[in-house]
Amino acid sequence: MPNIDTATMTPREIVQELDRHIVGQHDAKRAVAIALRNRWRRMQLPEELRNEVMPKNILMIGPTGVGKTEIARRLATLANAPFVKVEATRFTEVGYVGKDVEQIIRDLADTSVKLYREQAKVRVRNQAEERAEDRILDALLPRRSAGIGFDPEAARHEPSAQDNETRIKFRRMLRNGELDEREIELEVAVNASMDIMTPPGMEEMGQQLRQMFSNLGGGKSQKRKLTIKAARPLLIEEEAGKLVNEDDIRTAAIEACEQHGIVFIDEIDKVAKRGEAGSSGGDVSREGVQRDLLPLVEGSNVSTKYGTVKTDHILFIASGAFHLAKPSDLIPELQGRFPIRVELTALTKADFVRILTEPKAALIKQYEALLQTEGVALTFGADAVDRLAEIAAQVNERQENIGARRLHTVLERLLDVLSYEAPDRDGQSVTVDAAYVDAQLGELVQDPDLSRYIL
């Protein structure tokens, strides 16, 4: 199991954490919170029963810009488990030009191995730092030969208590950062990886070729002259890589991928067969993608470069706006594999007010922080926030409803002049009120033709 505290979070705690970043959509948050908690519950069961409990996959339905993708993004951070987000439109039926759906699981395995490798390196960090420190000191103060039979590798790892007085002094200076700008010459491992461009659908071949060239050049090193400040992170990374066991990492990562993996499939509605007459041209390929996804969701074995991954217990969360298609337009077998349906509601003016002010990294806080870097103290009055929310809701209603993304457009337009002039206004304070908002945006909002192209 992943070595994380978030694995034991209750559904209520998960929802509270999501509330810090996402406004509203309580039903969707509850659904993903319960699904996450069920992963933990399943792992507490006896092994015989554990294998019979399948994840309840989720289908999120709602217009664009209401928080579907943001929920997935925050969930990935929160779960600290193998997670991959893909767009259904990037995949095509087997035999067509495009990505094979099995690439989803290969990407998940890559993510899992990377996650576990980073965790393993964190565990050996202190030891790696000590080894890196010794290598830097060896470059600064080469050890004296101990005569016949002297083993330089054994000498390198002598206890620090046996260091001579000069070495102890240099070690203290090194830890205090007093030697950071001094240049040293070191043997540094060479990364023999090679970038290989492959056509769509042949990513696996590209990975295998990269691995082959990497193995051919493995173990090589070269002498480089670096400052101690630049050399230290390179040496720590290299020493940590020597200390971790790659076989153990791969075994644990594959198990985590199978037991805790989460796949988020966005824009699932774009591969649904649409009901209109005359739209059958692309339906064959769309239905083919669904049929290729079906074995992954039902449970199958996928070969990856780390080993075979069983997808039986991977949690799949799909989302789509379903403007032109309906969930019932998906093939029946795939519909049945997403038993939990959650509808996300369109955002209102009141939601926009909350989005602008409540989240931990709310848009207004972001702009205030950005302009503060130029020495401009920007503040938004409550009337300005209310007016901005009203304008965003109006434009969404009059034109295409793009949800909270409209706020980005409105705020960029509002602060266009101030952002341009900020370097010349160092030390000034600017308060944005409703009058300022109307002065900057009023004409655009009132003119439908202008707002269509600018807002």
From Swiss-Prot:
Keywords: ATP-binding, Chaperone, Cytoplasm, Nucleotide-binding. GO terms for molecular function: ATP binding; ATP hydrolysis activity; peptidase activity; proteasome-activating activity. It is found in: Cytoplasm. Pfam families: AAA, AAA_2. The keyword Manganese does not apply. GO terms for biological process: protein unfolding; proteolysis involved in protein catabolic process. SMART domains: AAA, ClpB_D2-small. ATP binds at V23, G65, V66, G67, K68, T69, E70, D266, E333, R405. SUPFAM superfamilies: P-loop containing nucleoside triphosphate hydrolases. GO terms for cellular component: HslUV protease complex. Belongs to the ClpX chaperone family. HslU subfamily. ATPase subunit of a proteasome-like degradation complex; this subunit has chaperone activity. The binding of ATP and its subsequent hydrolysis by HslU are essential for unfolding of protein substrates subsequently hydrolyzed by HslV. HslU recognizes the N-terminal part of its protein substrates and unfolds these before they are guided to HslV for hydrolysis. A double ring-shaped homohexamer of HslV is capped on each side by a ring-shaped HslU homohexamer. The assembly of the HslU/HslV complex is dependent on binding of ATP. This is ATP-dependent protease ATPase subunit HslU. It comes from Xanthomonas campestris pv. campestris (strain ATCC 33913 / DSM 3586 / NCPPB 528 / LMG 568 / P 25).
